[in-house]
Amino acid sequence: MIFNLKKSKKNEDGSNKDSKKTNETSGIEKKEKSNKWYNKIVNNSTKKDKDKNNDSIVYDDESKVGENDHHMKEYELEDQLKETLKSITALSIKVKEYEVKIEELEKELKLEKEKQINKEYEKELNEKSEFIKRQMELLKEKELNINLKENKINNKEIITLKREEKLNDIESEYIEKNKEKEKLNYEVTNIKMSLDKLTCEVQEKKDNLEKINKKVIEKENNLRELKEFMKEKNEIIESLDGTINDKKNAYEKLEISFEEKRKMIEMLDSKLIEKEENFANKQAKLEKENEIIIEKLKDIESREKDFKSKEEKFASMENELNTLKSDLSKNACQMEVYKLEIKDLSQSLVEKEREIFEIKNEYDDKINNMKEKLSSINDKGIDNTVLHSEEEKINKLLKEKETELNEIHKKYNLEIETIKNELNEKEEELEKNKKAHTVEVTNLTKEIKLLEKKTEDAKEGHKNELNELNNQLSKLNKEKDNIKNENTELNDKISSLNSEVNILNKDKQTLGNDIKTLNDLINNLKNEINTSDNKMNKMKEDLAMLNEEMEGKCVVIDEIEKKYKNEIFMLEEKLKEKENYADLNDEISILRNSIYVKEKEFIEMKEFYENKINLFNKNFEEKKNIYENELNSLRLKYDNEQGLIKQIDELNIQKLKTEEKYLQLYNDNMHMFRSICTKIDMPYSENIKGSDLVDFVTAYIKRRDESSSDANPDTTHKEMVAELEKRHAAIVAELEEKHKEEIAKLGEGHKEVVLRLGEQHKEETIILEEKHKDVVTKLGEQHKENIIKLEEEHKDVVTKLGDQYKEEIAKLKEEHAVVVAELEEKHKLGEGHKEMVDELEKRHADFVEGLEEKHKAETAKLEEGHKSEMNEVEKRHADFVEGLEEKHKAETAKLGEGHREVVAGLEEKHKEVVAELEEKHKEEIAKLEEGHKEVMAELGEKHKEVVAGLEAKHNLEEGHKEMVAELEKRHADLVAVLEEQHKAEIIKLGEEHKEVVAGIEEKYKVEAIKLAEEHKDVVTKLGEQHKEEIAKLEDGHKEVVNEVEKKNASLLNMLEENHKNEMIKLKEEHKESASDLVEKLYQKDEEVKNSNNKIEELTNVIKDLNDSIMCYKKQILEEVEKRNEYNEEINKLKIVQNEMKDMNDKKILEKENEIKKLNKKLSNYKVFETKENTYKNSEMVVNENKERIIVDSVCKENISESDVEGKGGNLKMTLSLKKKERNIFSINDNKNESSELVDTIKSAYINKIEMYKKEIEDNGKNIEDLKNKILDLSNELINLENMKNVLTDENNNLKKEIEIKDNKLNEKEKNENTEILNLNDDIIKLKKEISEWKDEEEKLTKENIKLKNDIEQINKEYKIKEENLMIKFNENINEVTSLKNQIEIEKMKLEELNKNYELLLAEKRETNMSISNDDNKIVENNILEDTDSKQNNLNKNVEDKTGDDINCEKNNDQAKEISYLKDEIKKISMLYGEELNRKNSYDEKVKNLTNELKELKIRNKKGEEAIAELNKLKNIKEKNKSVKQNDESSSNNIITKDGDKTPEYVSNDDKIQKDWKANLVLKLKEKPDLWDNINSLEKENFRVMSIVKENKNVQNDKIVGIYSYFKKCEKELKNDMLVICLVLKDILSILFLNDNFVNLFEKIDKILWKQMYIPTEIRILFLRYFSFLDKLRNYVKCVNEEYVNNERYEYSWALFQTYLETASNLKKEMIYYVLEKAEKDSCENNSSNFDKPKITDILNFSKDSIRLKTIAQLRKELNFEREAKNILNYDYQIILNKYHECLRKLKIVKNMARELDFNYNVSSKFSIKKELEMCSDENDEFKYNNIKNNEEKNDTIKDPKHNNLIQKIINLQRNKKTEKKKNNLVNEINTMYPGDTTPKGKIFTTNDNSKQNEILKKKDNINNNITHKNVYTGQVKNIFNEPVERKVRISFIHKSPFN
């Protein structure tokens, strides 16, 4: 669908245009703010029509008013569409710029990737990339924070929505209440009116007074009945109060029962305490065991310390060895010193001997001299005297000298002797020292050997000790593990006990919680009872009110009666006077009717009140039933709980009884055992077995029997036993009864005390809890009040600040408006407006910042104060609560201590009573000394039975424990639930407080943001207006100046570029060759480096392998030493084992010797007995008969021989024989008193017997001692054997471990040897490789030398080529000068054309003004004829001008492009020159120049193409003249049947192109937001049509448009207007006339609508044009009966309306904005041979046409030569991401375009056009009006900046001239304007098809446009359901972007 729109006429003055635009925009903005809905916009649009009547289109007199309103709506649509589409176009420009940047960055990326030389640069890039990654991570974190904030905001919005819903509910309730009040008021007024009427009627009516009186009496009776009814109700209420009191009593009983249960719980608590004490005792035992374990560990640590001390001793021994070795070395040094001293002494001796020889020689010389003198004297003949004297003197001297010599000889001899002696001594000392040294050395060697042996022995000993310690440690570890296991078991037991305790606690808690819940239920019931009481009171009050109302009504009735009586009295008097009774019957009938009506009203009132009373009764009964049901449920719960509690109590009591019985039996048994042991004279111990005790008792009984048989032979044992059994049974029964009675009494007393204490404790706890709750509630209320006060204060402060800031902002706005007005006045004069605006903006910004800072500071202070107050309140609350809790804990602790003291006193008393009973029992048991066998048997049987009973009860107790555990769990769950509820309430309070504070802050922030945005909008609008005006002035001035300069400079730049291109080609060829060589060199250098690196790596590997081999060897040696140590330790263990065996053998031998000695003693004893027996036999032969009798009596006795039996024989037999002998002797004494032999024998025998008895006793004691010793020795033997087995096992284990270690060591040695061999092989291989690498190095060096020589030759060739290029450059300069002269000639022609153009414009305006003032039809027809002729002339003049203008503009554009290319080439060359200077390596130069060459080749081609286009300009100018002549005859006229002429359609494409190109830059500068909005809409699959041109002629409403999704339309937009294009079939879905759409709409939740996405542009469109959509919807419903009366559709449409008002966004899937799809028209027949340009072809533009500044240029211009790398890398990665996004969008757009091409010719099933045609009276065929312009104007339209694809399409159009002549289809579509209709009976006619075909064959349209005309007849209502008649027809032409 296309919204066909008509622009208003343009004013002559530009100032008026701008002022009107500003007024319109300001008016629209005000309406957007003030009016929330479209109705206000529609109403305001009518007001604007009054101001624009002079500029509007002329209609007929009949339809003026409706059309004016309609067109003003259209104008508003146009303005709003312009605003939205401007923003969209700005966005598309930005996308294009980003795409261009991305392409250029890709190029530079490729260049930088090809370089890959500067490693430092790569490192920097890596660092930057890491930095960018970090920043990206930070950004992600920020995004997450933002998302969290958004979630919080959404939650807050949800909360606000809930609050809004609550407010709405409250409002609705309030409205309902108001309605009820209004109804009541209405009823009151009706009653008053009725009373007034009654008064009027009573005055006229007389006869019915008696009936009225009767009815009054009836009413009084009714009132009495009502009163009685009320009394009955009151009685019912009192009865209900009685039932409530009964329930209260029942609740009190329940409370009493709960208190009893509490007492039971306290009993359970006391039992728990006892169990805890037992548990504490068990813990103490465990702690003792742990202490024992710790002591064992300490012993182990002490042993470890001893071992360490031994190791230290061993180390000290080694140090001593080292000292001895050092002493030896010192002694050797001393020996050498002695030798040196001896040498010195010998040298001194030799010197002294030399001195002696010298002295001798001197003296000999002197003697000889003397002798010579003497001989000379003799020769002279000196006197003898003289000679004699002289001889004497000489002799004296000689003697003296001889004495001196002798002395000297003596001295020296002595010295020599001393020296010799010293030498001899030294030699002796030397020899001694040598001997001593040798001895010492031998001793030291021996000592060292001994020490080594000792060390080895010590090591072995230490190793053995270590092994022993290790064994001990292992044992201890095992013991440790066992202890740990025991600990774990004990811990498990403890945990189980803890769990049991916890279960009991949980049960306790559950019971407490149950009690609490029951208390809560009671409280709830009380509250409900109170509420019911309150309701009952309210009911009573209501009844009282009703009574009062009834009384009031009775009073009113009485008053009425009085009035009636008075009136009747008056009437009677009047009747007496008048006596006219003719009309009385009528009056009576009227009165009867009125009375009947009143009676009805009274009955209705009565029924109403009765219904109310019935409702109250029903409610009362329902509530009563509910309360009774609740009470019954509570009673059932209570009964169930009581049953459970009774069961628990019974089980606890049974458990206590069983425990008491078990303890009694155990104590009785223990006392029995003790008493038996004391009786038998045995030491009591707990470990005695029952069988042993039985044996001891039987032995004791036999002894007693023997003794008793000796004393009383006549009495028998059986009688004694029977008596004892009877006595024992009686005594035991009495004792048990007494014991049971006393225990029962004590238990009852204890229970009563415990219950009392529990009740006291519970009462105190309840009181404390209530107090605590009251205090907490008070604090909570205080806290809430404080919060409310703080919030109110905060709101007041915020409102004050907001008002202050609003006032200040208003003042600023006023000041700003004044200043802006002054600046505008100055701007009209043209004086410094920019500077003033900038200063004002700065001041305003500073002032706003100051205000914001103040506001922030004040809000921060308030928030801090609020927070501090809140913290103080919370702290006080927390302190108070803690104090209460501490008090509660202290009181509970005191109560617990008192309870424990009471329980302890009771327990002590109980123990004392039990002790007394035990003492009595012991005394009574002491009497029972006989009959132990049978008694013990009975006790054993009873014990078994008791044990079985206890086990059964224990099983029952386990079930009881499970029940208790379940109860504890329930209690814990209840406690957890209550704690969670408390926490949740605290959290809710905190959250509510935070939400309130946040809401206040958000409100204030929103207000501040709104004010700031409004102010910014005002400033930006003024700035934009100012910039637009300045830009227009500057552009007009600059274009004139720059055109001349650019044209002159363009030719010179072209020549310079050609020269540079050639130079660059040569350089690049040179650099390519050089770069190849250099790359080879670098490759070989890198290979050499790699080889060296490999050699170094291999050497390092070899070193590592050697080190590893050494390490392996060391490890092997260490392991060998360890093995030796292990062997030594094993030997030591064997020695210790042998010693232990020897010790054991010795002990065994000693014990065997002792046993032999004892056997000897026994044998001696037996010999003695045999002797004695022989003696007895010899003496007792006489009394054989007596002996037989005695023997028979003895044989009758039942004696067990196995009890007192030794190794030597039967002792009992000897004892019996002795007794026999005694009897025999007693008989013999009685009979033979006279015989003396018998006396002597008797006396002797008695003495012997006494001796024997003593010896037997001694021997018995010895035997017992020996038995004990034998047992001890046997135990020791067993222990020693166990030790021996353990040691043997350990020895075997050690041997196995040693064998395993030996095997492992052998394997390791084998593996290491194999590894060493492998490594040696690797080393040999590596050495070979090293030699090969060295050979390759030599080869590479030779190749490098050759390459250098080649490079020098290439440089020489390069210089020669440069000289040739300079010659060509000079030739090109001459050509440039000739072209300049030609350009100056063309300038003159352009000036003349401009003058002609201005004249034509003036004439055109005059014609338009004259046409607009005419109204009548006759004048219109005349004007049509005149305008046809004028228009032809205008078209001629315009075309003359436009052709020249287009050519001039093309020259300018081409010059701009050439200069732009030159600038880029210069900048790039400069940049690369600088980089070449920086990096003096051949490889970089070559790569850079190759890349430059590739780029410049592309640009050179473009430059050559531009030059070729310049040369074509001359030919185009010549062809324009023929085009003008052809255009004059190219107009088509369409004539109707009535003779009305249709407007002519003239193509003004040249002018349109000029307008597009002239104002493109202005469009982009003025409205940058336009493209942004277009791009945002394009993202949502929304496409826009730009109305580029519309004809000013009213009769010829021709509109030219272009789709703005085509990227090249940016260059051709000027005064365009944007139109939204929708798919016709989708209108049904948008209008909610489609099931699918409505189903989707109904699925969406209402709350979600407020969170849906919708672009702001689309939402504004819907809000503004909702009335249009509503009318369109009504039209569709009228056309299609399917959609009429569909409630779902209507309901969803109404909801949609409300959501558009409230919601900020909509769901994307709800509305579809798509490109327009053409219907399947008659043109499909001719489309087979027509090559339509596809949308995909439009989108496939080349990326070379998109040009932006390169990174290098940015680097130069921004002065970031050093910092450019960091900045540009960061920017590069951001732009890369944007580039990928652009590519994705391109793919999406291309896919859409393909779909559109596929579906282009498919028509939808439903369309408004078809329906309009169906409704119209006549259906005309679609006709075509094809207008052809010059073919060659297609060439002129081409812009030099178009891409290669457009050039290809133009070439195809040129080549297919013949096909175009055949296929006469064009892209022009004539659609009907909404008001375009024709009157009935009128039919539009066109030329015949034959004529049209002839015209089409002759001429083709320049635009290749299809002109599609929809002709409708009859008066049909438009889309707005308005009747319209209009003869003016509008055709919409889609402009092809290729022309």
From Swiss-Prot:
Repeat positions for TPR: 1089-1122, 1466-1499
Source superkingdom: Eukaryota
Residue stretches of biased makeup (Basic and acidic residues): 10-35, 61-70, 1537-1547
Keyword Mitochondrion attributed: no
Span list, region Disordered: 1-70, 1520-1547
Residue span of region Leucine-Histidine zipper: 713-1076
GO CC term, one of those recorded: membrane
The keyword Coiled coil is annotated on this UniProt entry: yes
Subcellular localization(s) per the UniProt record: Host cell membrane
Coiled-coil ranges (or none): 88-644, 1041-1161, 1249-1410, 1472-1520
Alphabetic keyword roster: Coiled coil, Host cell membrane, Host membrane, Membrane, Repeat, TPR repeat
Recorded domain comment: The leucine-histidine zipper domain contains 32 11-mer repeats divided by two 6-mer repeats into three blocks.
Protein name (record): Repetitive organellar protein
